[in-house]
Amino acid sequence: MSRPTGPQFWPPFKPCPCGSGRSYAACCQPFHTGERDAPTPEALMRSRYAAYALADADYVRRTWHPDTVPAELDLNDGVKYTGLRIHRAEGDEVEFTASMKGPDGQPHNMRERSRFVQLDGRWVYLDAAE
């Protein structure tokens, strides 16, 4: 039996999965609940990473540009997100490495330079820069 996932199951007093060092309630939870929008591309990147870690596909889709969002998104694929390192956040781009363990338990790192745009006054993920 798998354990429940999603932001509603992450205690607000625990450290935020984005690795900021702050509690979830003081970091990404207000973005996940829709209480506030992420004010910067880096804050959005961190909140999206936390959403992946918590299997919150609704938030990931909600913060993805409608022209580039995939038709299907499965965050219950057995991947365990283990860390986020921001290398650079400048303008509308954030370069980061996401660490994870695959369903087979093997560690993986994904490095990406993400591009963000403002849509209707809020930041959304556009794509990975080439």
From Swiss-Prot:
InterPro entries: NTF2-like_dom_sf (IPR032710), SEC_C_motif (IPR004027), UPF0225 (IPR023006), YchJ-like_M (IPR048469). Disulfide bonds: none annotated. Pfam families: SEC-C (PF02810), YchJ_M-like (PF17775). Signal peptide: none annotated. HAMAP family: UPF0225 (MF_00612). Belongs to the UPF0225 family. PANTHER family: ADENYLATE CYCLASE-ASSOCIATED CAP C-TERMINAL DOMAIN-CONTAINING PROTEIN, UPF0225 PROTEIN SCO1677. This is UPF0225 protein DR_0483.
